C-alpha cells in the first residue's frame, strides 16, 4: 500500500467535490505538506490556477477573484504559520460576503504538540470567523469516500457567504509514483465522477418574504440609503428611489451614480438633517457605509421604521434601530416591492447637494489628493472598473466625487484594513479581465508591496495610483495628540515607489501636474500591462481641504 498514492486519491475527491459547487479559481502557495492537494488541483482541468509565494497576499487574491466572479474560490496552503496568514482575508470575506474555501494541509495528529517541525494546532484556529470548519481525519480507506464527499457537500451546499475552513492532515511519504492503492475506494463513488452535480444536494435557504405593508409605506416620506451593492443593483436602486420621490444617499460603493453627490459634506448642514427628520421610513439597501457624516446621521435618525436589505445574514445596524432586517438579494427585493410614482418631498437637500458639488469644483485646479478624488471619474477606463483602497482615499472619493451609475466599484470595506489591497485588486482584475484603475495610499502600498509580483500578470491594462502623502494622513482628521501625532499615528516613511516598480518590471510615472497625469493615463491604457503612477502630494492638504469644505458647506 502506498501512502502517497492514497493521499492523492483522497485529495482528488476533495478537489472534485469543489467543482460541483462552482469553484473554478484556485489559489496555491508553495509547500510540501500540501503536495496531495496541489497535485490534485493541478490534474483537475476544471480549475484556473493562480500562484503566489505569500499566503497573506494569496488569501486576498482569492478574495478579489470571489468579489467579481460571485463564486467560491479555493485556497491551498501548507501547514504552520502559512495557515495563519489567511486570517485577514477570511475575516474580510465573512463581513463582505465573498465565499472562500481554505484547504489547509496539516501534520497528522501524532505530530502535534510534541515538538515536530512546522506543526501547530490548526483545527479551530480561526475561531468563529469561518461559516463552517471541518477537521478531516488522516486519509484512510476505513472511511468511505461517500462520507468525505458528502461532508464537503454539506459545508458548501449551505454556504451563503464567508469562508469554509477544511483542515487536511496528511502523513508521509508525500511523494511517490501513483499505483492502484485506493482505486477501488475511489471508484465506489460510481458515476459521480462523470456527473457534474454534488453527491449531496441541500435545499437553499429561505429569503425574506414580501413585506405585505409595503404598499402603505411607499406612500410615506422615505429616505433610501445605498451601501455596497453590484453595478446592476446600483442602477435599479437609483431608478427605484427616483420613482418613489425619495432622496437617495449613495455610498461610494453603491454604484447608484450618487444623484445627490457630496453627501458626506451636505449631511453636515443643519438644514439637511432637519429636513431628513421628516422621514417616516428609511430603507437601507446594502451595508458597509463609508462617510462619517452619513454614519452619524444614520445613528441619530429616528424614523418610524428602519429597514435593512442585504443578502448577507446577521445584524448590520450598529445603531440598533427599531425596524426590519430583511435578508434578500437587492434586485429581487426591489421586484417584490415596486415603486409608486410620487413627487420628491425634499426641497433643501437637492439644493445643498448642488451647492456642495460647486464648492468642490471651485477647488479642483490645485494638484492634490482631494482634487484627484474629485476628478477620479475623469480617469476611469471605458468598460472597466475601479478598486478603491481604505483610509483617507476612500473617504475623499466618497465625499468629493460623483461616480457614474452602474460603473463597477470594488473595495475591502468589511474590516476596512489596509493589508492585502494590492492583492485584492489583482484578483479583481484577473476575474473580470477588464481594464482596472486601483487607487491606494502610500502606507497601503508598502503594506502589500510584494503583491506587485501579482500585478505582473494582468490580462488588460491596470493602473495603480499610489497617493503618497507620506504617512497615515487620515489621523489628521482625528483629535490625536498633536505632540505624538507624527511619531505614533502618521508614521511617515519618506519613500518613493520608482525602484519598487522597477524591481517588478512595471511601468512607472510620477506626474507633477494634471497634464502629466493625463499623459501617463493615456500611455497606460494602450497596453495590457500594469502601470504604477505615484502622485506625491503635500502631507496634510487632502485632510485640510476636506475639513475646509465641511466647514463651508455646513454654513450654506
Curated annotation (Swiss-Prot):
Listed Pfam families: TPP_enzyme_C, TPP_enzyme_M_2, TPP_enzyme_N
Catalysed conversion reaction: isochorismate + 2-oxoglutarate + H(+) = 5-enolpyruvoyl-6-hydroxy-2-succinyl-cyclohex-3-ene-1-carboxylate + CO2
BP terms from Gene Ontology: menaquinone biosynthetic process
Highest taxon of the lineage: Bacteria
Enzyme's top EC category: transferase
General function of this protein: Catalyzes the thiamine diphosphate-dependent decarboxylation of 2-oxoglutarate and the subsequent addition of the resulting succinic semialdehyde-thiamine pyrophosphate anion to isochorismate to yield 2-succinyl-5-enolpyruvyl-6-hydroxy-3-cyclohexene-1-carboxylate (SEPHCHC).
Protein name, entry field: 2-succinyl-5-enolpyruvyl-6-hydroxy-3-cyclohexene-1-carboxylate synthase
Organism, as annotated: Escherichia coli O139:H28 (strain E24377A / ETEC)
Lineage summary: Bacteria, Pseudomonadati, Pseudomonadota, Gammaproteobacteria, Enterobacterales
Amino acid at each position: 500500500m502506498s501512502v502517497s498514492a492514497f493521499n492523492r486519491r483522497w485529495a482528488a475527491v476533495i478537489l472534485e467535490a469543489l467543482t460541483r459547487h462552482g469553484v473554478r479559481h484556485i489559489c496555491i502557495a508553495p509547500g510540501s505538506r500540501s503536495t496531495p492537494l496541489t497535485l490534485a488541483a493541478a490534474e483537475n482541468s476544471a480549475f484556473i490556477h493562480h500562484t503566489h509565494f505569500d499566503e497573506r497576499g494569496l488569501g486576498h487574491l482569492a478574495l478579489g477573484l470571489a468579489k467579481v466572479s460571485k463564486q467560491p474560490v479555493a485556497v491551498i496552503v501548507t501547514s504552520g504559520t502559512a495557515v495563519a496568514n489567511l486570517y485577514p482575508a477570511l475575516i474580510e470575506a465573512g463581513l463582505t460576503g465573498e465565499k472562500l474555501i481554505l484547504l489547509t494541509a496539516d501534520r497528522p495528529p501524532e505530530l502535534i504538540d510534541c515538538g515536530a517541525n512546522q506543526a501547530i494546532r490548526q483545527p479551530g484556529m480561526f475561531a468563529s470567523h469561518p461559516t463552517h470548519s471541518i477537521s478531516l481525519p488522516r486519509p484512510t480507506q476505513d472511511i468511505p469516500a461517500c462520507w468525505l464527499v458528502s461532508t464537503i457537500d454539506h459545508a458548501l451546499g449551505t454556504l451563503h457567504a464567508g469562508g469554509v475552513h477544511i483542515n487536511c492532515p496528511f502523513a508521509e511519504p508525500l511523494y511517490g509514483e501513483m499505483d492502484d492503492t485506493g482505486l477501488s475506494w475511489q471508484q465506489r463513488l460510481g458515476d459521480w465522477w462523470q456527473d457534474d452535480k454534488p453527491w449531496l444536494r441541500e435545499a437553499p435557504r429561505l429569503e425574506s418574504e414580501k413585506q405585505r405593508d409595503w404598499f402603505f409605506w411607499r406612500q410615506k416620506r422615505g429616505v433610501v440609503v445605498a451601501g455596497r451593492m453590484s453595478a446592476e443593483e446600483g442602477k435599479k436602486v437609483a431608478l427605484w428611489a427616483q420613482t418613489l420621490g425619495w432622496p437617495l444617499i449613495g455610498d461610494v460603493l453603491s454604484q447608484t451614480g450618487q444623484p445627490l453627490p457630496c453627501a458626506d459634506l451636505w449631511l453636515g448642514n443643519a438644514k439637511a438633517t432637519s429636513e431628513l427628520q421628516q422621514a417616516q421610513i428609511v430603507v437601507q439597501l446594502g451595508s458597509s457605509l463609508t462617510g462619517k457624516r452619513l454614519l452619524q446621521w444614520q445613528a441619530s435618525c429616528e424614523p418610524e421604521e428602519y429597514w435593512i436589505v442585504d443578502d448577507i445574514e446577521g445584524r448590520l445596524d450598529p445603531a440598533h434601530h427599531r425596524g426590519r432586517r430583511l435578508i434578500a438579494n437587492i434586485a429581487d427585493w426591489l421586484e417584490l416591492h415596486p415603486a409608486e410614482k410620487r413627487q420628491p418631498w425634499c426641497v433643501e437637500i437637492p439644493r445643498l447637494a448642488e451647492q456642495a458639488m460647486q464648492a468642490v469644483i471651485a477647488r479642483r485646479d490645485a494638484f492634490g489628493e482631494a482634487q484627484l478624488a474629485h476628478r477620479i471619474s475623469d480617469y476611469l477606463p471605458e468598460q472597466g472598473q475601479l478598486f478603491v483602497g481604505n483610509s483617507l482615499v476612500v473617504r475623499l472619493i466618497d465625499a468629493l466625487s460623483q461616480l457614474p451609475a452602474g460603473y463597477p466599484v470594488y473595495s475591502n470595506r468589511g474590516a476596512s484594513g489596509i493589508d492585502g489591497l494590492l492583492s485584492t485588486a489583482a484578483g479583481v482584475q484577473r476575474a473580470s479581465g477588464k481594464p482596472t484603475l486601483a487607487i491606494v495610499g502610500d502606507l497601503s502600498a508598502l503594506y502589500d508591496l510584494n503583491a506587485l509580483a501579482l500585478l505582473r500578470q494582468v490580462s488588460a491594462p491596470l493602473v495603480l495610483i499610489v497617493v503618497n502623502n507620506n504617512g497615515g494622513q487620515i489621523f489628521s482628521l482625528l483629535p490625536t495628540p498633536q505632540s505624538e501625532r507624527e511619531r505614533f499615528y502618521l508614521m511617515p516613511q519618506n519613500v518613493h515607489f520608482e525602484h519598487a516598480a522597477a524591481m517588478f518590471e512595471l511601468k512607472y510615472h510620477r506626474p507633477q501636474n494634471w497634464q502629466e497625469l493625463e499623459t501617463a493615463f493615456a500611455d497606460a491604457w494602450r497596453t495590457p500591462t500594469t502601470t504604477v503612477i505615484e502622485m506625491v502630494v503635500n502631507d496634510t492638504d487632502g485632510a485640510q481641504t476636506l475639513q475646509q469644505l465641511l466647514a463651508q458647506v455646513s454654513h450654506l
